[in-house]
Each structure stands twice: as structure tokens, then as C-alpha cells.
Swiss-Prot record:
Subcellular location: Nucleus, Nucleolus; Nucleus, Nucleoplasm
Ranges in a coiled coil: none
UniProt-listed PROSITE patterns: WD_REPEATS_1, WD_REPEATS_2, WD_REPEATS_REGION
Protein's UniProt name: Ribosome biogenesis protein ytm1
Chain's gene name: ytm1
InterPro entries: G-protein_beta_WD-40_rep, NLE, WD40/YVTN_repeat-like_dom_sf, WD40_repeat_CS, WD40_repeat_dom_sf, WD40_rpt, WDR12/Ytm1
Subunit structure comment from the entry: Component of the NOP7 complex, composed of erb1, nop7 and ytm1. The complex is held together by erb1, which interacts with nop7 via its N-terminal domain and with ytm1 via a high-affinity interaction between the seven-bladed beta-propeller domains of the 2 proteins. The NOP7 complex associates with the 66S pre-ribosome. Interacts (via UBL domain) with rbg-35/mdn1 (via VWFA/MIDAS domain).
UniProt source species: Neurospora crassa (strain ATCC 24698 / 74-OR23-1A / CBS 708.71 / DSM 1257 / FGSC 987)
Family classification: Belongs to the WD repeat WDR12/YTM1 family.
Keywords of the record: Nucleus, Repeat, Ribosome biogenesis, rRNA processing, WD repeat
A GO term for molecular function: ribonucleoprotein complex binding
The WD repeat ranges on this chain: 120-159, 166-204, 217-256, 290-330, 381-421, 452-487
Amino acid sequence: MDHPTESGAQVRVTFTTQEEDIQLDESKRQLLVPADIRRYGLSRILNSESMLDTNSIPFDFLVNGSFLRGSLEEYLNANGLSLETNITLQYVRSLIPPTYEASFEHDDWVSAVDVLSATSPAGRWSGDNFQRGQDRILSASYDGLLRIWDASGNVIGTSPSGSHGGHTASIKAAKFLSSTQIASAGMDRTVRVWKYTESGESYERRGELKPTLELYGHTSSIDSLEVDGASKRILTASADGSIGFWTTSKASAPEVSDSSLLPGAHTSKRRKLATSVTAAQRGPLALMNIHNAPATAAVFDPRDRTVAYSVSQDHTVKTIDLTTSSVVSTFTTSHALLSLAALPRSSASAPLLACGTSARHITLVDPRTSTAATSVMTLRGHANKVVSLAANPENEYSLVSGSHDGTCRIWDLRSVRPATKDEGGMGSVSEPVYVIDRESQQGKKKKSSVTGDGCKVFSVVWDQLGIFSGGEDKKVQINKGRGVNAE
């Protein structure tokens, strides 16, 4: 077989893309190019006046599902292909490596992070009530407090302590419901809904978090919380193995059915008076005991809010019909599942479910397939548990993960390869395109043999403002990059 090693060799390529705004005319899609050309040269060809005639858009190129990392010549040699091979190149806008932007200091571990912006879910749910330019970051900490930050790293508001209506133990999860409402949950087994208001001039804003609703039903720590501001609904996953379904409406929320769960049930009268608050106390719309081990995450279907998905340390992924509080399907995986994200797909009615595992990888599951099916893809690269996941808000094919190995990793599902024999030999595998390390560990000597010890990532969220992560280093870290998010 001939190999393209001779000087001046050329290869015929066919350019394709799935991005409508950068489609080539059909007459321009096939071209002869030098065999030794690389990504940069191909990108220049596409941007040229005779092709797309664009302002230097950086492109990456996929060949058979994998990114082209060398020259076309090297690709042909590696795959035993001759010069006569017509190579189909799918071109996509490049992701630029995310750069470190800032860190916000805390007094204790940061367990959860969320963002309020014009493009975030809560920003959209707020409608006209959200003021553009007043982006906010929400953090939850093991010290039992919520904090609201402005984009400059100033704390605008802090939740009250446990004796004044706040959480009485570490907070594990928190989300914006809107620009004026927040939900949080944690180790005190409660979900708390807060009214958030701001006052003062733009250069000296002050925020107030006032507890308005306490939700009781779980009998153990609540480790995950998901919200839908449009329907005023909340999903929770608890170490008691159950999934909670709640409303933020006091009028439609049922009374607490088990009075022993209320804070005053085992407290002296003097203690009750000292900690009494005016927040209403309500129970769940449904409490579904569907897992045989701690439930670790639950999310709404991106398109159908009457459907939810949950994962657990019992190795299962469950599809839930929220109208009947029943399990529709169960998928059993090989490992304990610790995190979950639903990735919308324009070509399918159901999302792709990304499940972070205790085995250091991410399993992608299609909930439409049979209960006997295994994962459709595996994302490998982390060196410790994967405890947080977030989809890219701008496309369907990338996500970010947070791990106890002290990193966040960005994945592109268009870049895949067959699994090797050591990886089980079945399905497809993808590897991270970028790794975000903790800035707090730069220049520090490693003190422990445990990967990620002292800098575990507990939470990550992806917004057009950037990638925000919080963890064991007591910081919220912000990373930005063109293509990864808006500049």
C-alpha cells in the first residue's frame, strides 16, 4: 500500500459541518490540499476569501469522530490509508482553553455554586424582573451559610444563622429560582426557600436573604437539589434513598405529615422560643422511596417537566413520572452513581443522561433504550470520584465535570474512539479536551498521596459568564474562554 510520504503530495478532502451559519456552498466542499497540512492551515483555507470569507474563525476538524491532532499525512499513515483516500473533515468552531479569572474566598468548604445572569435558567425565569448587568453568584458552604456575590467578588448578602431561621447544619445544595428567590438544602434534612432583595446604589448594593418556607420530609441529609422556577417545583435527592418533589407555593404545599420531623419535636420550650421564626413549614408533594442506597442526584427532563431522572449509590438510573410519582424505567450500571446532568438533544425526544461515578468516569445513558442496555459512551480521564456535572448552555455536545481529584474537565462528545480491551471493549470512549486545575494549588507541594486531597471539587456550573466551581479549598473559582463561554 502506498503511503503519502513523497514531497508535494496532496489529499482530496470534503468539508462538512452541522453549524448552519458557516456552511460552505456545495461547489466549494471538495478540495485538494497538501498532505502535510495541519489544523491551522485547514482553518486558514476555510477562512479565506474564496471559501467562507470570514474574520479568522479558529476551527477544529473531526475525522471519523475524533479531532485531527496532527497532519493529514500522519492521520493517513496511522490508519494505513493511501493518498487516494478522500477524507471527510467535519469543521467546528474551536474551544479556546479556559483561563483562570478569579477566586472568591470562604471560611469553610464550598459545597454548591449557582449563577444568576441574563442567560441562566433563573435569569430567564425572572423575566422583566431581572436587571441586565446585575449578574450574581450564589455559594453554599459547610459553615451553614449562603452567600450572594457580585461579579467583582464582593459579598452582597449572607443568609442568617440557624438561630435566626437559617440552616442548622452544613448546606449541600443551593439554586436560584429567580432573581428574588433561592432554594437550599443540606445536612439538617430540610429544604429552605428564601426571598432575596437588594437595596442601595449600584456601587454599594446590599442584599437580604429572608427565610419564607421550610420543607420537611427527608429523614437524612439532602445532598442534591434541582429547581424549575417556571413551575415553582423542586426536586431533591437524599441519603435516605428517596427523591422529594416539592412546591415553593405555601398555598398549594401540603402540611407536614410527620410532626416528628419538625425542629420543635425534640426541643425544650426555652429552645423553641430562642430559635422561633416566621417561615411557614410544609411537606412534599411526593416523597418517593425508590432507591436502595443514598440517592445522590435528581434532575428534571429539559423538555418535559413532568418527567425526572435520579441516580443513586445503588448503581441505578431511574426515570420518574412526576404526575403519578412512579418509576417508569430503571437502568443498572456497574458502579455507584454520584452526579447527574441531562444533556438536551434536538434530534431525540429524550435527553442523554451523564452520570458521574465512584469509579472515576462518566457514563452516558440513553433513557429511551431497554432496561438491559448499558451506557452508550464512557468519558474517561478523572482520577477520583465525579461528583458534579453541568451541560454547556450553548450546545448539545459538551459538558463540564467536577471531581474529588481537584479538577474540572471539559468534554466534547463529538470526539470519540472505540473502547479498548482494557476498557471492556464495548461502546465508545471520549477523553477530556481541557482540564481546569484549582488555582489555589498552583506552586504548592503535594502533601498527600490521595489524588485531590485538600482541593476536591464539590460543585460546578456552566454559564455563558464562565465556568464556576467550588470545593475543599474554600473558594469559588471562575474560568473563562472563548468558545467555552462568551467573553
